[in-house]
Design a protein with these regions (language model features):
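Glycine-rich phosphate/cofactor-binding loops in nucleotide/flavin-utilizing enzymes
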Residues: 328-377
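Register-specific recognition of a single heptad position within extended alpha-helical repeats
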Residues: 3, 7-10, 227, 234, ...
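Glycine-rich beta->alpha junctions and the first turn(s) of the following alpha-helix
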Residues: 192-277
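C-terminal helix-coil-helix/basic helical segment that borders enzyme active sites and/or dimer interfaces
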Residues: 24-32, 255, 278-309, 319-330
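Generic structural signal for well-ordered, non-transmembrane alpha-helical segments
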Residues: 241, 270-277, 304, 308-315, ...
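Glycine-rich flavin
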Residues: 36-46, 50-153, 157
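A short core secondary-structure module
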Residues: 151-185
Length: 377
């Protein structure tokens, strides 16, 4: 079914709340590999969320990036992450891909993306190279790709992927490529403890021939800020949802045992709730800063710090949950066990110490007192 939204009538957060029970209800089976996330993606489409990241001009609301739809984007990712972090991860990649196609695609490419997404197509961004990094060269009628991607999320679910590739001059280019050829996908390498339901793995692009319109933007546009590192607030919003899910599960378990009134257990719940709210404020403010129409490259620092703040909140909350519930939360089938595995895996990032160091240097170079870093002219 092809959808188009009425921007002034569509409530993305309400739509996320509507589908959340279905996503949560299927999460355990998806983690065990008994079902795929196909039904979840269809639910997102029928609720209007798949086309929501499209610009208003294309039948969406610009969810997560257009003014007026950024705060809603934070809450949508948070609600989805609370229901099933694997689904939220795929949706975040979809939002990122739609935004990149809108930022850098030709008019023809944007129209193609809009048609596909309104029809329910899930998009993704695949940036991690495999043993043979993806390269591109020009052919007579377009470009030809070679090499492969790893950690490609949503194999069998993603229809169009934004893929990074190195051109003959050593620059990174973005390419919009079809991703639904099962012969090119290989999930066998995805032997991980968390985020198993994302159907990730390797994707071989060798010999893939595409029109020149498949190129998005110019050389190294992929790394332009605040759209590159600045976009990590979306990861953090999804992760925050999982932290909230852990906190809710702790409260439910303690209440069932009649232990929520115990002063030590109540304090653990309160500390977890405080961590959630602190993280939420970090993410919301980072999103509004980065996605502002006049955002400068330096605003990406706030998003990096928000992601690190969420990682700290996650670590602190997992400690509180472990102390509150003990061994019960480590039994297979307990909601906390699965959510913790997914969250712990998703939190992993390359060189977090380097990210913190770079952010600290950027902060130190700012003028004015600490409390005015983000508000001073």
């Amino acid at each position: 079914m092809t959808l188009a939204l009425h921007a002034h009538e569509f409530d993305a957060v309400a739509a996320a709340h509507d589908v959340a029970p279905n996503l949560e209800g299927r999460a355990a089976a998806a983690d065990r590999g008994e079902v795929t996330l196909a039904a979840d993606i269809e639910d997102l489409h029928m609720a209007g969320l798949i086309c929501a990241p499209l610009g208003v001009f294309a039948g969406g609301i610009g969810l997560c990036w257009e003014p007026g739809a950024v705060a809603a984007g934070v809450d949508v990712l948070r609600v989805l992450g609370r229901a099933n972090l694997a689904v939220a991860r795929l949706f975040e990649g979809h939002v990122n891909a739609v935004k990149l196609a809108t930022l850098y695609g030709t008019a023809a490419t944007q129209a193609r993306v809009a048609r596909a997404v309104r029809g329910g197509a899930l998009m993704g961004v695949w940036g991690a190279d495999g043993a043979r990094p993806v390269t591109l060269r020009e052919g007579r009628a377009g470009i030809i790709l070679d090499g492969g991607k790893r950690f490609a999320s949503g194999l069998g679910l993603v229809s169009l992927a934004v893929i990074s590739a190195t051109d003959g001059n050593g620059a990174t280019r973005l390419v919009l490529a079809p991703a639904d050829d099962a012969r090119r996908a290989d999930e066998s390498s995805w032997k991980v403890s968390g985020m198993r339901a994302t159907a990730s793995g390797d994707f071989d692009t060798s010999g893939l021939e595409l029109d020149f319109d498949a190129l998005l933007g110019g050389p190294d546009d992929y790394y332009c800020e605040p759209h590159f590192q600045g976009g990590v607030w979306r990861y953090a919003a999804a992760q925050l949802g999982a932290i909230e899910a852990l906190t809710n599960a702790m409260r439910t378990d303690l209440a069932a045992r009649g232990r929520l009134s115990d002063p030590h257990q109540a304090a653990r719940f309160a500390r977890a709730a405080m961590a959630c709210e602190t993280a939420r404020l970090w993410v919301r403010e980072a999103a509004l800063t980065v996605e502002a129409p006049d955002a400068d490259p330096g605003s990406a620092t706030r998003a990096v710090l928000a992601r690190l703040a969420v990682a700290r909140a996650a670590t602190d909350t997992m400690v509180e949950v472990d102390r509150a519930l003990g061994t019960a939360a480590h039994f297979l089938g307990h909601p906390v066990e699965r959510i913790r595995r997914d969250l712990s895996f998703y939190l992993r990032q390359a060189s977090p110490d380097d990210a913190l160091h770079a952010a600290s240097l950027a902060l130190a170079a700012r003028a004015g007192p600490v409390g005015d870093f983000w508000t001073a002219p």
